Amino acid sequence: MTTLAIDIGGTKLAAALIGADGQIRDRRELPTPASQTPEALRDALSALVSPLQAHAQRVAIASTGIIRDGSLLALNPHNLGGLLHFPLVKTLEQLTNLPTIAINDAQAAAWAEYQALEGDITDMVFITVSTGVGGGVVSGGKLLTGPGGLAGHIGHTLADPHGPVCGCGRTGCVEAIASGRGIAAAAQGELAGADARTIFTRAGQGDEQAQQLIHRSARTLARLIADIKATTDCQCVVVGGSVGLAEGYLALVEMYLAQEPAAFHVDLLAAHYRHDAGLLGAALLAQGEKL
């Protein structure tokens, strides 16, 4: 049975057909509508899936935000704009006439990355560092989603009680400091207004402020990982996302994690499926009927 997998992110929409063998084919991508209105998202999703839907028997969605009763929610409403409470499952069922499931994108990616691990690993955590910071937890070989879909939203744990206010309403969340948006928000002077991609480029060119911003992000993530190790006793942590996979970033996280007491050390791995983990994880969950 073929699954039409869809990944809804802050900057892009992706879709692909995924067979029972887990192979990704006919992958398509569009920018996430800038207007962030329900109408714009529905139109973009229609354009994305219309060439693929005839070849699939079901739809599996991995989306930013919390998925509750098939609709979009978020701890940080800024990540969704006008899409809060968007009826995601209902919309795709109407567009495709196919049975549809939906799950948070980081939870989906965690499941895909877990399947790719070698060895006898039953407990792992996936962290995505991108526009925001999200995650997914596998414990005892099972993906934790929670009754309200909140499990794994580790970007909203406390990093600095005196830090910036996060869009979720808390002060000093990991996401407000370590994410691409957090990196950009802290930029000053000639870097003010630059996005995270530009800041990484400038860091590679030797810009001291840019390097400090990236180190601040990596140090914050390392402390989060130490907390995760203490909380879950996971066997490894897999890091993905556009910031997490940026050149040199994971090495910085490893450097700062090594400065923590040995009990909080854990193996760090770069995401195996990189930017397709959400697509594949949603399809795998649909195939296993685990939602």
Swiss-Prot record:
Keyword Nucleotide-binding attributed: yes
Transmembrane annotation, as ranges: none
Entry keyword annotation includes Ribonucleoprotein: no
Any single Pfam family the record assigns to this protein: ROK
Pathway: Amino-sugar metabolism; N-acetylneuraminate degradation; D-fructose 6-phosphate from N-acetylneuraminate: step 2/5
GO biological process, one term: N-acetylneuraminate catabolic process
Reactions listed under catalytic activity: an N-acyl-D-mannosamine + ATP = an N-acyl-D-mannosamine 6-phosphate + ADP + H(+)
Alphabetized UniProt keyword annotations: ATP-binding, Carbohydrate metabolism, Kinase, Metal-binding, Nucleotide-binding, Transferase, Zinc
Enzyme Commission no: 2.7.1.60
Binding site for ATP: 5-12, 132-139
MF terms (GO), sorted A to Z: ATP binding; N-acylmannosamine kinase activity; zinc ion binding
Highest taxon above the source species: Bacteria
The protein's assembly and partners: Homodimer.
Functional note: Catalyzes the phosphorylation of N-acetylmannosamine (ManNAc) to ManNAc-6-P.
Name of the protein in its database record: N-acetylmannosamine kinase
Source organism of the structure: Escherichia coli (strain ATCC 8739 / DSM 1576 / NBRC 3972 / NCIMB 8545 / WDCM 00012 / Crooks)
